Amino acid sequence: MENNTILKKYPMNKIMTSMLLFGFIITGFSDLLLHGKMSYSSIMGMNTSRVYFYTFFLLIIGCWLLYNKWFVGIGFICLATFSSYFTEYVSIHNYFASIAIYFGLIIDVIIRKKMKWLIPLIIVGLLQGIAFQTGWFGYYMVGFMEFSGLCIGSIFIIKTI
């Protein structure tokens, strides 16, 4: 009886989306802490087995989000495509793919008319951009901004499904 109530209150696509997004956040963050890295990008490109794992994970998340009509899925697919493991893709990974996620999320916010969500996303995006460009914040700040951006974006997506 309780199981039926949970599925009525939370649709299956909301449960699946939250499992995928927060599964990625928790897996990446724990992997990051265990290996002493400073950002999600650095842990994703650490070795070939991680490249395969995170690429597959990001492709699943991106396709799932696109299937559920979320443009931010394009950004996840870009992150999967341009892995930071390959040195020729590092700048594309750091700039194009990260920006694609923010643009996709901003488009999703505008389409769903939830403008108050733009404020924290813009703040986190600007701080992450500054952290990438300067050594002023250090790379720990880049990792913290990646974590914050992923959490804020994931909460927005899950709340509005």
Language-model segments: what does each one mean?
Residues 70-120:
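Membrane-proximal helix-loop-helix units in multi-pass membrane proteins
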Residues 53-64, 100-110, 148-161:
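Hydrophobic cores of alpha-helical transmembrane segments in multi-pass inner/ER membrane proteins
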Residues 8-15, 48, 85-93, 138-141:
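Membrane-interfacial loop-to-transmembrane-helix junctions in polytopic alpha-helical membrane proteins
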Residues 116-161:
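Terminal transmembrane helical module of multi-pass membrane proteins
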Residues 19, 26, 58, 65, ...:
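Hydrophobic residues within membrane-embedded alpha-helical segments of Major Facilitator Superfamily
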Residues 32-36, 81-89, 129-138:
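Juxtamembrane "helix-exit" motif on the non-cytosolic side of transmembrane helices
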Residues 1-66:
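N-terminal topogenic module of multi-pass integral membrane proteins
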Residues 16-19, 52-55, 71, 93-103, ...:
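Physicochemical signature of membrane-embedded alpha-helices that form the seven-helix bundle of GPCRs
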